Curated annotation (Swiss-Prot):
Organism in which the protein naturally occurs: Bacillus velezensis (strain DSM 23117 / BGSC 10A6 / LMG 26770 / FZB42)
Name of the protein this chain belongs to: 5-methyltetrahydropteroyltriglutamate--homocysteine methyltransferase
Pfam families: Meth_synt_1 (PF08267), Meth_synt_2 (PF01717)
Cofactor(s) in the UniProt record: Zn(2+)
Residues reported in the UniProt entry to bind L-methionine: I435, G436, S437, E488, D603
Sequence similarity: Belongs to the vitamin-B12 independent methionine synthase family.
Example GO biological process: methionine biosynthetic process
Enzyme class (EC, first level): transferase
Length: 762
């Protein structure tokens, strides 16, 4: 008889009411002392674990909770401190300096955690690092929960293969040697856990799902070196986000358990299991509930899936768990949530997913009859959800069916458009602009709250937005920017704003998830067909344009980003959803152009993150992603300049797709790549308009004019001068006014210096 247990891989850190965010930001602002700060975070850690214990999860993780990022935790624990931060003596100050930067040292690079909306701090390797274990966080966390609750838990750590794969600063040929140098540190950490009596440790190796067979074999040697030093500690090797190609090699690792994702594996893990079986002496930790979406499960369907897995895995112990950490979904349904009943009842967040695991466990142990009530309840909830969504359906399918190839392409080539736009727009060499948003002060947030609480009328709120817009148009004029933006003060979030004005979206009040650091977002819920209702941005953009003789950019979020930053429905394909959004936005683009706006930016910062993890699956996604963008933008005249913006990406992977977007100008977050993309451009020139971000907007640090000038000068070594733009990395919403104005002044001054140099070269 197989023993069935429930397990979890990770839990949201932020708290039901974003207490984690508020605690961090109060400390960063100096409003909380260190002792109070650490005590408050400890309380949040305990609360997260207690929630899981209260849901009767058999195997609860610890050390997934962090003060900023779990990858950064691993780096700091192994003394991977970049040189520029080693003079800082306090460990907490060092930790946050790496994440956020300080006056004289830029922060470490931040990038997407695989193909999710979470960002991690990229570990930096250099030969001067003294490899040593500075802190055993896993042991500290295990002891803390044992002390507080008397509970046995499962410490979690990023594994050596994934950690080095995610790091930078070394040649590819050095990777295996660096991994081997980490082995003694893992052994030390794990032996300390073993001495404490820890029963299980979860070592996360998601990078193995994209690893070659050779690398999977090489990583096996790491685990042979690690586990041969252990005698009483059980190791669970955990993969997620996709299937493992070298399945037979992986399940032969010298560990006591293997975690596999049976949700996002496209059926491949299950096929491998059926073909090759699974070692009887190992625990199979099966991801059977989606850790990344927010929809209630069909209990019978998921129970059948778990039974199918069990029928092909002759194991003594099966753990059922989410497909990945629940970091990617909200904490729990909030008692004050305002959604329609049938929609709310069809949702399942982290806490609810743990309860669903309990139902599946009971069904596996006692049969379907034991959970018949829950089966019927889930079917009724999903039926009501479908009826609710169907009520919002539109005639958009007919519009999509009538699209032709002409609807996906501009009338003229880029070179022809460029000549017309240069004549029409009259911009200087190296034009300066920003990416869209400006700081949202406490006054802006307060005004929005007053309006939402009905303390202010629509007219009062619009008057405030207009005043703030005018103030920042004046500031931009004074700074000397060439192409202005209205500042987006009416928007809380670049996706939420559009979803609120399109049919087919629902918005929560409390369903927050972590994006990076203390930054939290509320992804929209796409429950029905997406449809344009009325112009969304025209009024505010036209007002801003009336305040200046300079060009004002229209600012939209692109269809792929809206899709990738939402919780999408699962009853139709992602491609179909993207095309629905693209068709709706196409009407907004046309409305802006008809209103006299000559530069329209359609942001796609999340285009790359939607890539499937396996390159064999890329072409299909990239093809329809580019098509959705062109569907949005191709209705405009040749004289209208289309911009797009991307951030946090390994752009080398998608340069062909960037070109296929056929945008006239693309602005790219660049400063945190520390010159990496420039190196790529030396070998692979980009011929359309390009703006490489010249300073990091995620840090309060104000870069000097000379520093920005040098970045521009370096870029012009490889980028065409007549189509290069100067801009910050991303929007400036989260920054303070003083630092924003100072940085932009320096940026404009640097651009002027660069123009002078270019004039001298002519």
């Amino acid at each position: 008889m197989t023993t069935i247990k429930t397990s979890n891989l990770g839990f949201p850190r932020i708290g039901l009411n974003r207490e984690w965010k508020k605690t961090l930001e109060a400390y960063w602002k100096g409003n909380t002392d260190k002792e109070t700060f650490l005590k408050e975070l400890d309380g949040l850690f305990l609360s997260a674990v207690k929630t899981q214990l209260d849901q009767h999860i058999d195997i609860v993780p610890v050390s997934d909770f962090t003060h900023y990022d779990h990858v950064l935790d691993t780096a700091v624990s192994f003394n991977w401190i970049p040189k520029r931060f080693r003079s800082i003596t306090d460990p907490v100050d060092t930790y946050f300096a790496i994440a956020r930067g300080v006056k004289d040292a830029v922060s470490s690079e931040m990038t997407k955690w695989f193909n999710t909306n979470y960002h991690y701090i990229v570990p930096e390797y250099d030969e001067s690092i003294e490899f040593r274990l500075t802190r055993n966080k896993q042991l500290d966390d295990y002891r803390r929960i044992k002390e507080e609750f008397g509970a046995e838990t499962k410490p979690v750590i990023v594994g050596p293969y994934t950690f080095v794969t995610l790091a930078k600063g070394y040649e590819e040929s050095e990777a295996k040697a660096i991994q081997k140098r980490l082995v003694p540190l893992y052994v030390q950490l794990l032996k300390e856990l073993e001495a404490e009596g820890v029963k299980w440790v979860q070592i996360d190796e998601p990078a193995l799902v994209t690893a070659s067979s050779e690398d999977v074999r090489a990583a096996k040697e790491l685990y042979e070196s690690i586990t041969k030093e252990l005698s009483g500690l059980n190791v669970l090797l955990q993969t997620y986000f996709d299937s493992v190609d070298a399945y037979e090699e992986l399940v032969s690792y010298p560990v006591q358990g293997i975690g596999l994702d049976f949700v996002h594996d496209k059926g491949r893990n299950l096929d491998q299991l059926k073909k090759h079986g699974f070692p009887k002496d190992k625990v199979l930790a099966a991801g059977v509930i989606d850790g990344r979406n927010i929809w209630k499960i069909d209990v019978e369907e998921r129970l059948d899936a778990a039974l199918d897995i069990l029928s092909h895995a002759d194991v003594e112990e099966l753990w059922i768990q989410p497909s990945s950490s629940l970091l990617h979904v909200p904490v729990a349904k909030h008692p004050d949530e305002h959604l329609e009943k049938d929609l709310l009842n069809g949702l399942s967040y982290a806490k609810e997913k743990l309860a669903e695991l309990g139902v599946l466990k009971e069904g596996l142990l006692s049969g379907k009859a034991a959970v018949s009530e829950q089966i019927e309840e889930s079917k009724a909830a999903l039926k009501a959800l479908k009826a609710f969504a169907t009520g919002a359906n539109s005639a958009q399918k007919e519009e999509l069916n009538q699209l032709t190839e002409k609807d996906f392409s501009r009338p003229a080539s880029f070179e022809e458009r460029l000549a017309l736009q240069n004549e029409s727009l009259g911009l200087p060499l190296l034009p300066t602009t920003t990416i869209g948003s400006f700081p949202q002060s406490a006054e802006v947030r307060s005004a929005r709250q007053k309006w939402r609480k009905k303390d202010w009328t629509d007219e009062q709120y619009q008057a405030f937005i207009n005043a703030e817009t005018k103030r920042w148009v004046d500031i931009q004029e004074e700074i000397g920017l060439d192409v202005l933006v209205h500042g987006e003060f009416e928007r809380t979030d670049m996706v939420e704003y559009f979803g609120e004005k399109l049919a087919g979206f629902a918005f929560t009040k409390y369903a927050w998830v972590q994006s990076y650091g203390s930054r939290c977002v509320r992804p929209p819920v796409i429950f029905g067909d997406v449809e344009f209702i009325e112009p969304m941005t025209v009024k505010d953009t036209v007002y801003a344009q009336s305040l200046t003789e300079k060009h004002m950019k229209g600012m939209l979020t692109g269809p792929v980003t809206i899709l990738n930053w939402s919780f999408p429905r699962v009853d139709i394909s992602r491609k179909e959803i993207a095309f629905q959004i693209g068709l709706a936005l196409r009407k907004e683009v046309k409305a802006l152009e008809d209103a006299g706006i000559q530069i329209i930016q359609v942001d796609e910062p999340a285009l790359r993150e939607g890539l499937p993890l396996k390159t064999q699956d890329w072409d299909e996604y990239l093809t329809w992603a580019a098509e959705a963008f062109r569907l949005t933008t191709s209705s405009v005249q040749n004289e209208t300049q289309i911009h797009t913006h991307m951030c946090y990406s390994n752009f080398e992977d998608i340069v062909d797709t960037i070109n296929d977007l056929d945008a006239d100008v693309i602005t790219i977050e660049h400063s945190r790549s520390h010159g990496g993309f420039l190196e790529y451009l030396k070998e692979h020139p980009y011929v359309k308009g390009l703006g490489l971000g010249v300073y990091d907007i995620h840090s309060p640090r104000v870069p000097a004019t000379e520093e920005i000038y040098q970045i521009i000068d370096d870029a012009l070594e490889v980028c065409p001068t007549d189509r290069f733009w100067v801009n910050p990395d991303c929007g400036l919403k989260t920054r303070q006014q003083e630092e924003t104005v100072a940085a932009l002044k320096n940026m404009v001054d640097a651009a002027k210096q660069a123009r002078k140099k270019q004039a001298q070269l002519v």
